[in-house]
């Protein structure tokens, strides 16, 4: 099991959050679970999303055209930077 730390800017946190919440079923179906969502101190539109699951599932989800469309609709301004890690 790995943890994935994704960062990206959004147009508006208030616009993004409901779409992220609505997409939980897709993350769950992909074998990923939510760990947490964080906003950068001093910049509420710069986000860190932490997920947990299988690295192959994460890669597949990130390549999904459905996710790309959801991110566009949610106002994501750039592709996420992803750090994948395993707890030591």
Region roles according to the model:
Residues 30-47, 70-88:
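Glycine-rich beta-strand-turn "strand-cap" elements at beta-sheet edges
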Residues 9-11, 88:
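Short, flexible beta-strand-to-coil junctions
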Residues 2-9, 36-64:
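Short, well-ordered beta-strand segments in beta-rich or mixed alpha/beta enzyme
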Residues 12-34, 66-71:
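Short amphipathic alpha-helical segments
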Residues 1-2, 88:
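Absolute protein N-terminus
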């Amino acid at each position: 099991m790995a943890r994935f730390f994704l960062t990206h800017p959004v147009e508006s946190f208030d616009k993004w959050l409901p779409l992220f919440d609505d997409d939980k079923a897709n993350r769950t179906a992909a074998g990923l679970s939510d760990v947490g969502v964080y906003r950068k101190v001093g910049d509420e539109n710069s986000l860190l999303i932490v997920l947990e699951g299988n690295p192959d599932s994460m890669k597949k989800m990130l390549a999904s055209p459905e996710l790309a469309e959801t991110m566009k609709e949610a106002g994501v301004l750039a592709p996420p930077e992803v750090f994948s890690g395993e707890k030591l």
